[in-house]
Each structure stands twice: as C-alpha cells, then as structure tokens.
C-alpha cells in the first residue's frame, strides 16, 4: 500500500482513482498529476515503481494543497468570516445555510434534527 501525502492509497485500484482518496485531489487534479509525471491513467497502484510513487509525491507536495493544510486553510477562512461579522460569517456562526437557501422548511442537514414544539397537537 503506497503512502502519499499521509494517506494510504489502495493498491488494487487504478492510479487515477486511488489519488482521489487524498483530500483536495479530485478527478481533474489526479489526471493533471499523472500527465505531469507521464504515467498512464489505466495503470494500477501495485504496478507503480518506487520511483514513480516518489515522483507523484513530489508533484503533490510542490503544486497542490492537500489534507491537513487544506482543511486548516478552509477552517481559517470560515473563522475569518465569523470574526469579521459579515453575513456569511453570521450564518456560519448560527449553523444556518450560507448560500441563500430557504430555511422556513428544509435545511435540516445544516440545522440538525427537528426540535418538537410543545402544544402543537391537533
């Protein structure tokens, strides 16, 4: 099992798919990485040489923000919005949808389970 960017990527999958197990690398970025390193995207992880794994690791470390660094930056961006007190920051602080969705009904994922109200029986 190859370890890239602190993540054990599965050995029996294609490299294009396996790279997507790393937080911050999707389909497009995985294809870009393989193109830079000149590895066929239909090759499996267990067929990679140690040199190829090392090249992939170097490209990711040099050109992409992944895993902990990406999570930290995302968290810092949200914290910055909350500290500014702007509308988006207030929505984050209150645990409500940030991007203009309705909240009269729905928004249960963001708001959590429905709270029952006493005296609403018919």
UniProtKB/Swiss-Prot annotation:
<dbReference type="Pfam" id="PF00416">
    <property type="entry name" value="Ribosomal_S13"/>
</dbReference>
<dbReference type="InterPro" id="IPR018269">
    <property type="entry name" value="Ribosomal_uS13_CS"/>
</dbReference>
<dbReference type="InterPro" id="IPR001892">
    <property type="entry name" value="Ribosomal_uS13"/>
</dbReference>
<keyword id="KW-0694">RNA-binding</keyword>
<comment type="subunit">
    <text>Part of the 30S ribosomal subunit. Forms a loose heterodimer with protein S19. Forms two bridges to the 50S subunit in the 70S ribosome.</text>
</comment>
<dbReference type="GO" id="GO:0000049">
    <property type="term" value="F:tRNA binding"/>
</dbReference>
<keyword id="KW-0699">rRNA-binding</keyword>
<dbReference type="GO" id="GO:0019843">
    <property type="term" value="F:rRNA binding"/>
</dbReference>
<dbReference type="GO" id="GO:0003735">
    <property type="term" value="F:structural constituent of ribosome"/>
</dbReference>
<dbReference type="InterPro" id="IPR027437">
    <property type="entry name" value="Rbsml_uS13_C"/>
</dbReference>
<feature type="region of interest" description="Disordered">
    <location>
        <begin position="95"/>
        <end position="122"/>
    </location>
</feature>
<dbReference type="InterPro" id="IPR010979">
    <property type="entry name" value="Ribosomal_uS13-like_H2TH"/>
</dbReference>
<keyword id="KW-0687">Ribonucleoprotein</keyword>
<dbReference type="GO" id="GO:0005829">
    <property type="term" value="C:cytosol"/>
</dbReference>
<protein>
    <recommendedName>
        <fullName>Small ribosomal subunit protein uS13</fullName>
    </recommendedName>
</protein>
<dbReference type="GO" id="GO:0006412">
    <property type="term" value="P:translation"/>
</dbReference>
<dbReference type="GO" id="GO:0015935">
    <property type="term" value="C:small ribosomal subunit"/>
</dbReference>
<dbReference type="InterPro" id="IPR019980">
    <property type="entry name" value="Ribosomal_uS13_bac-type"/>
</dbReference>
<comment type="similarity">
    <text>Belongs to the universal ribosomal protein uS13 family.</text>
</comment>
<keyword id="KW-0689">Ribosomal protein</keyword>
<comment type="function">
    <text>Located at the top of the head of the 30S subunit, it contacts several helices of the 16S rRNA. In the 70S ribosome it contacts the 23S rRNA (bridge B1a) and protein L5 of the 50S subunit (bridge B1b), connecting the 2 subunits; these bridges are implicated in subunit movement. Contacts the tRNAs in the A and P-sites.</text>
</comment>
<keyword id="KW-0820">tRNA-binding</keyword>
